[in-house]
Amino acid sequence: MVEGKIVQCIGAVIDVEFPRESMPKIYDALILEGSELTLEVQQQLGDGVVRTICLGASDGLRRGVVVKNTGNPISVPVGKPTLGRIMDVLGRPIDEAGPIESENKRSIHQKAPAFDELSPSTELLETGIKVIDLICPFAKGGKVGLFGGAGVGKTVNMMELINNIAKEHGGYSVFAGVGERTREGNDFYHEMKDSNVLDKVALVYGQMNEPPGNRLRVALTGLTMAEHFRDEGLDVLFFVDNIYRFTLAGTEVSALLGRMPSAVGYQPTLAEEMGKLQERITSTKKGSITSVQAVYVPADDLTDPSPATTFGHLDATVVLSRDIASLGIYPAVDPLDSTSRQIDPNVIGEEHYSITRRVQQTLQRYKELRDIIAILGMDELSPEDKLSVARARKIQRFLSQPFHVAEVFTGSPGKYVPLKETIRGFKMIVDGECDHLPEQAFYMVGTIDEAFEKAKKIQ
């Protein structure tokens, strides 16, 4: 191993000098002598000096400390020994359950699969959440984004998806906690443990309190583990919470490295960094990666460069709205803003397609009439419009659903609604078969039959 020494420390940025003839390559991992600390090479400054980002706390570092070059990028353990374990960005266990006995290691920097290896799929993935299955259905092997501002329910929605898909799915899952709260990571671990699926999940955490280098690379660590399972011919679920923190860590690192910021202070390489990550999250002829990514939307502004860059990579976007959350309708998915590439009669079938479009038309009409209702009241509307409004309000309430993961808070048991039941329920509402029922009967129920039962109790 070639040795160098630290010549400058500025926060998480460490400059290391090596002999000129053996200068480390970009992304090489360097190790500090006598410590567990790893540095990753980001720039070559010339004359044997490289600029690195510290993957860990840089407290106590000083000039002259000896650094060794491993000659390879950061490699993490992959395969079955990682299942049921919690790891950090370097693949080291942080669950105090002993070392990870994995013979296979894989570099976190990999090329995206070649064009001829890709295998797009149109097979639907049922989630059991009415609004998602109806409005923005997921494809097996597709990429899904949960967009929302602070506190509208991204993490709860993701937990419910994990609960409904990962438990039914039976395959392996990888969860990458990128710059989120440690408490959520802890809750998730115990949730998995209690439902006996922990032995099928690998957990990788780089939480809010960690240096930017860790938060930037932890998504790649999780992805590398998911890629390994995919290349072994398995269908993997890959959950990321939160992609925005990945971008934010990139912004911090970019500023530390002295690059000029671009729009809104983001790094100039935003699109490239996002592309490098997203292009690897894909399905090949060997196996599939179905990914669900939470995306924080700063100040509820979907045109912010970070969420805007993410949009282009996704097959389905689930947009969570503060207005809908304020009505008490959860999940607070906006049925007019959320989209999916699967909404095509050739993929989901003519019936599902027409019901989805009719539901959206009814809700859109209600949205247009809201101003008139606010100014003139309901009495000024035509009979057709009154009917549209009544149905739209029923649809709005029927799009709500009690979640399994929120049982502790709400006290009402969670509901899993099969796709056929979802389509049947909304078909009955738009066909006018539920016009005689009060709208509160549709709030927080599972199937349409439960709404009829609830209506009897109300009346």
Swiss-Prot record:
Topology in membrane: Peripheral membrane protein
Disulfides per UniProt: none
Presence of keyword Membrane: yes
GO molecular function per UniProt: ATP binding; ATP hydrolysis activity; proton-transporting ATP synthase activity, rotational mechanism
Subcellular location: Cell inner membrane
Catalytically driven reaction(s): ATP + H2O + 4 H(+)(in) = ADP + phosphate + 5 H(+)(out)
UniProt keyword annotations, A-Z: ATP synthesis, ATP-binding, Cell inner membrane, Cell membrane, CF(1), Hydrogen ion transport, Ion transport, Membrane, Nucleotide-binding, Translocase, Transport
GO cellular component: plasma membrane; proton-transporting ATP synthase complex
Family annotation (CDD domains): ATP-synt_F1_beta_C, ATP-synt_F1_beta_N, F1-ATPase_beta_CD
Keyword Membrane: yes
Subunit structure: F-type ATPases have 2 components, CF(1) - the catalytic core - and CF(0) - the membrane proton channel. CF(1) has five subunits: alpha(3), beta(3), gamma(1), delta(1), epsilon(1). CF(0) has three main subunits: a(1), b(2) and c(9-12). The alpha and beta chains form an alternating ring which encloses part of the gamma chain. CF(1) is attached to CF(0) by a central stalk formed by the gamma and epsilon chains, while a peripheral stalk is formed by the delta and b chains.
Family, as annotated: Belongs to the ATPase alpha/beta chains family.
Name this polypeptide is given: ATP synthase subunit beta
Species the sequence originates in: Burkholderia mallei (strain NCTC 10229)
